[in-house]
């Protein structure tokens, strides 16, 4: 793989910035009585969030527990405020679905 480096002083273009918003959401699924019911609810949440916010999102942990779930997500863009806004709206959307309650949300925004 070839990486091209150009001196920035020769060009009057703005330096390109990539902003990554990533995190882990822990959900309370107390009303679920089986893993099958939990998977059904999570599948619904993940599909709705993907379709609404165009985000990479998946169940990442706590697969064997039916009363709690952990999902990870990632947004990529070029504006820190826009990514932060999308994350806030996504969290509100998940809570508004009333399928599971957010216990904890760990969010990190990285600028490269």
Where is each model-derived feature located?
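Short beta-strand elements
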Residues: 53-60, 101-107
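Short, Lys/Arg-enriched N-terminal segments with co-localized hydrophobic residues
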Residues: 3-17
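Hydrophobic residues positioned within well-ordered beta-strands of beta-sheet architectures
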Residues: 21-25, 71, 105
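Structural beta->alpha junctions
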Residues: 28-32, 75-80
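C-terminal binding/interaction regions
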Residues: 38
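Short, charge-patterned binding micro-sites
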Residues: 20, 58-78, 110-111
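Short glycine-/aliphatic-rich beta-strand segments at the starts of folded cytosolic domains
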Residues: 21-30, 35
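C-terminal structural segments of small proteins and small subunits
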Residues: 77-112
């Amino acid at each position: 793989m070839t990486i091209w480096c150009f001196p920035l002083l020769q060009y009057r273009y703005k330096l390109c910035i990539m902003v990554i918003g990533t995190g882990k959401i822990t959900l309370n699924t107390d009303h679920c009585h089986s893993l099958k019911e939990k998977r059904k609810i999570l599948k619904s949440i993940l599909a709705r969030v993907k379709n609404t916010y165009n985000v990479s999102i998946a169940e990442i942990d706590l697969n064997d527990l039916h009363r709690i779930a952990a999902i990870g997500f990632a947004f990529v863009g070029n504006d820190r405020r826009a990514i932060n806004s999308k994350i806030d709206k996504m969290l509100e959307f998940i809570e508004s679905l009333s399928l599971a309650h957010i216990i904890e949300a760990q969010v990190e925004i990285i600028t490269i």
